[in-house]
Amino acid sequence: MKTTLFASRAASGLILLTALAQWAVHSEVATPAPLSPPSIDGTYELMKRVMANGTVLRPPSIVALYTMADGRFSLNLFVKNADGTIASESSVGRYTFSADKYCEWIVYTIRNNLDKPGVTNEAPAVTDHCAPVTSKDGRFNFSPPGEGVEVSFGAEGFTAKIGGEFVDRWRKIR
């Protein structure tokens, strides 16, 4: 009887072992889906500029469109100054973006009454084209080289802040 019980248990164990081996051989290892790299690509429309004194500028006093796609960018900005003159910028360039670094190279720019009176096609001077990126609460934060601006990108758009001067609010439209 003990021999029969032992043989029965051994056979059951062998069947279980065979089933597990078959399952292991024929099952596929689950691999996690690859994570897509972080991206700030999109087309953004400037919704408003809040000045340090609380004044809010909205279109048509300020109008801008910023497109970033596949490592290329284009920015067009027009601001009606308090004295009625127009300040503007149109820039095109290249950029790279990762979770820890943003790099930017302005290929061409024309600026009118923006950084200084008159028209210039000189891009801001930079010693390093790259800046560190930090991530917090689903937002990417960095300061593009040479611009003196702090940006914070999220799914809905981004904000751009220049010191004690103003904060721009951009909405992602595409």
Per-region residue spans from a language model:
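Bacterial N-terminal signal peptides that target proteins for export
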Residues: 2-13
